[in-house]
Amino acid sequence: MLDFTFHMPTRIIFGAGRLAELGRTRLPGRKALVVISAGGSMRRTGHLDKVLALLAQNGCATVIFDKIQPNPVLIHVNEGAALARAEGCDFVLGLGGGSTIDSAKSIALAAANPGSYWDYIQSGTGGRKRPERPALPVVAIPTTAGTGTEADPWTVITREDTNEKIGWGDDSTYPALSIVDPMLMVSVPPAVTAMTGMDAFFHAAEAYLSTARQPSSDLLALEAVSLISQFLPQAVKDGNSVQVRTMLAWASTAAGLCESLSSCISHHSLEHALSAHHPALPHGAGLVMLSLPYFEVMARFQPKRCADLAVTMGEDIEGMELREQGLALVTALRKLIAAVGLDGLKMSDYGVTREEIPALARNARETMGGLFAVTPVDLREDAVIAIFEKAYR
């Protein structure tokens, strides 16, 4: 029986060159905390100067917060929130990859509410409080095609002292405005292009398998899987094509919409445990490492849906039995991972040991248990351990 809720309040301005509209579109405030990464890429590429100039053109004052790490951490969220309050900022603008925009959302919530951001986390050691006020408005300007955070309310932050990487979001953390300009993505290096692109792929594939899915998320998920399968290898080989970058930017946004209308599943929970304990591990890389044994399990129990994904990726399944049709997804995934140069990734290269696996499995279920609830397979702790063991090298 068809039963769903469709809610998507974000205004999305999409297209090459459309960043210029930041200088004239209506903004949700008059003073922005501009959140960027600590790595300096937004300054080196000139993206920050361009955004600051456009905001000034629009009569908006700015304060810069530039401490965000690839796996963003609680201390910086609380620090950014304190700065926003002290400077009287009335909205937060995230410029950069998913980590930066996620941080902007968390800072926006913490700036509007008392205490620590972690007081409002609903699992693990979180305080499980309800926010007293909605988050400050958020503007998202992504410079990578990966998380799709410009099209969903979710934010993922790590508490370092407890090795917990936990998601949060409500209606107030949907961006009020997102500007997706593929021109900002042309400078992204091949390895980052590959890892962020695979993150977008898994958002879409997981949303298609999730028990929270709905008709609109299915359509968007298959669109994203098709585009990423076709264009991500091209972008890794030559990232200068604006047309290719545009297709990937749309795929990432479409996958982000899937996260709003459906949900990721426990594949993401397993990865969050990995990168919570090993923050140098890029999120997309961790997902790739876990993906083949994880989706092999999904294919055994959800062969029809996995077969749909395989066909969308270009696999010929005609004449196969249903079980083999489902497992064709694993074949297609292995090909895509190799095509984007990520088939050599190893957990051990990031300091992960086999001895950690039971603790990682527990962490995944304790901190991101909500995604297990929408996974179409009942993955108990022994099954999670088995996936980690098979993925380990």
Segment roles from a protein language model:
Residues 306, 313, 317-393:
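C-terminal charged capping/lid subdomain of soluble metabolic enzymes
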Residues 1-91, 347:
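ATP/NTP phosphate-donor binding region
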Residues 262-329, 334:
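C-terminal catalytic subdomain
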Residues 201-205, 248-256, 270, 291, ...:
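Short alpha-helical scaffolding segments that buttress acidic/His motifs in well-ordered protein cores
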Residues 211-220, 235-247, 262-267, 281-284, ...:
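Flexible, glycine/charged-enriched surface loops at secondary-structure junctions
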Residues 154-262:
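Carboxylate- and glycine-rich phosphate/diphosphate-binding segment that chelates Mg2+/Mn2+
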Residues 75-183:
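Glycine/threonine-rich beta-strand-loop-alpha-helix active-site module
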